[in-house]
């Protein structure tokens, strides 16, 4: 089953981690791959302590992708794509695979839609979770459960006023 959490609202990763928790509650092995994140979140710190979870991420510069120079973008894209390749190679070991921010990696051209569609097709027996913004029509067409989280307000907006 393919779960897609997308949109400009907060909570996509949090919702995805709820599915991860459900799988862990059923003693299932889970792979969590974080694209464009450095793995330093509290959630990843917790998940790394769980014996049934494998977490993959790559060090990230303290810049958004669009702020990086060409050389840094190439290096970052290669390291992020290597995460996807590892997920492809090890997918059979897991009941559930979270590809966090994969939709953003697709939008930025770090991952190619054709390879993602092949991955999704090859892993229909698994719970696959994609998060991020702006999924393509082809990706959405593969989804079994699709949730769009919309931005309405943020406490930080109040603080900035």
Locations of regions flagged by a protein language model:
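A short helix-turn-beta junction within AAA+ P-loop NTPase domains corresponding to the substrate/partner-engaging
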Residues: 142-150
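Short loop/helix-cap segments at secondary-structure boundaries that form the rim of catalytic
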Residues: 48, 137-142
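Phosphate-binding/switch loop-helix module in NTP-utilizing enzymes
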Residues: 69-120
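Short, polar loop motifs at secondary-structure junctions
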Residues: 132-136
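Loop/turn-to-beta-strand initiation segments
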Residues: 94-96, 124-129
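Conserved small/polar residues in nucleotide/adenosyl-binding loops
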Residues: 151-156
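Conserved P-loop
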Residues: 2-86
